[in-house]
Amino acid sequence: MKVVAQEEIAPAIFELVLEGEMVEAMRAGQFLHLRVPDDAHLLRRPISISSIDKANKQCHLIYRIDGAGTAIFSTLSQGDTLDVMGPQGNGFDLSDLDEQNQVLLVGGGIGVPPLLEVAKELHERGVKVVTVLGFANKDAVILKTELAQYGQVFVTTDDGSYGIKGNVSVVINDLDSQFDAVYSCGAPGMMKYINQTFDDHPRAYLSLESRMACGMGACYACVLKVPENETVSQRVCEDGPVFRTGTVVL
């Protein structure tokens, strides 16, 4: 895919715009497996898709520098090309939601980006969207303005430097509304909280982060156990990254 643009949107967090025919097949919640453009890094890097523009065959990826491979991605500029596998994963189930429904989005840190496309598509259908975001501090806050285009947004920070002090549970535990669906992505602690809080919700989903090797389900490097069945496992890359709450052990 061709690099259209790239900018640093927060300290060590970059937004990368790619263009190519692959965009036509993309869905909210899927990810791309990017090859680092050098000979020293053999493993691809999985990066979630934050927004999709099929009309212009473009997609946006937001990632954090977390090692030498992603540091190399941050040096890419307009006109460069990337070896990309994808789109991969199952994505979020957004079916059967319309103006009669209310949905909760919960994101934390670098797990926020895949929720942007979800919010956009649901808003286009008239769904009422409520978003709760959690970050470490004010410098880490991303996509609040973009998500606010599609509904009400609450922001929490661990140190209270922006928004409400605490984590997302401070807001969620006080929400009186009933939600027809819940979509979430974030750090392991946040995902455990969502998994427990919405354990019996029929349409609550977790988008899980995991280190991957092959990205195609063959190597079993990203497996999760299934509740009450030690012999069954789920692969984050192939069976996920989106799972219904209560269906995997976190």
From Swiss-Prot:
Recorded hits in Gene3D superfamilies, A to Z, give:
Dihydroorotate dehydrogenase, electron transfer subunit (2.10.240.10), Nucleotide-binding domain of ferredoxin-NADP reductase (FNR) module (3.40.50.80), Translation factors (2.40.30.10)
Name of the gene? pyrK
In this protein, which residues make up the domain named FAD-binding FR-type?
1-94
What is the role of this chain?
Responsible for channeling the electrons from the oxidation of dihydroorotate from the FMN redox center in the PyrD type B subunit to the ultimate electron acceptor NAD(+).
Query: Which protein are we looking at?
Result: Dihydroorotate dehydrogenase B (NAD(+)), electron transfer subunit
**What are the UniProt keywords, alphabetically?**
2Fe-2S, Electron transport, FAD, Flavoprotein, Iron, Iron-sulfur, Metal-binding, Pyrimidine biosynthesis, Transport
Q: Give, as in the UniProt entry, the pathway in which the protein acts.
A: Pyrimidine metabolism; UMP biosynthesis via de novo pathway; orotate from (S)-dihydroorotate (NAD(+) route): step 1/1
Q: How is the cofactor bound?
A: Binds 1 [2Fe-2S] cluster per subunit. Binds 1 FAD per subunit.
Record InterPro entries? Cbr1-like_FAD-bd_dom (IPR008333), Cyt_c3_hydrogenase_gsu (IPR012165), Dihydroorotate_DH_ele_sf (IPR037117), Dihydroorotate_DH_Fe-S-bd (IPR019480), Dihydroorotate_DHASE_ETsu (IPR023455), FAD-bd_FR_type (IPR017927), FNR_nucleotide-bd (IPR039261), OxRdtase_FAD/NAD-bd (IPR001433)
| Subunit and partners | Heterotetramer of 2 PyrK and 2 PyrD type B subunits.
Q: Where does [2Fe-2S] cluster bind?
A: 214, 219, 222, 237
UniProt keyword Methyltransferase, yes or no? no
Name the family the entry cites.
Answer: Belongs to the PyrK family.
For the keyword DNA-binding, the answer is no
Q: Name one GO molecular function term.
A: metal ion binding
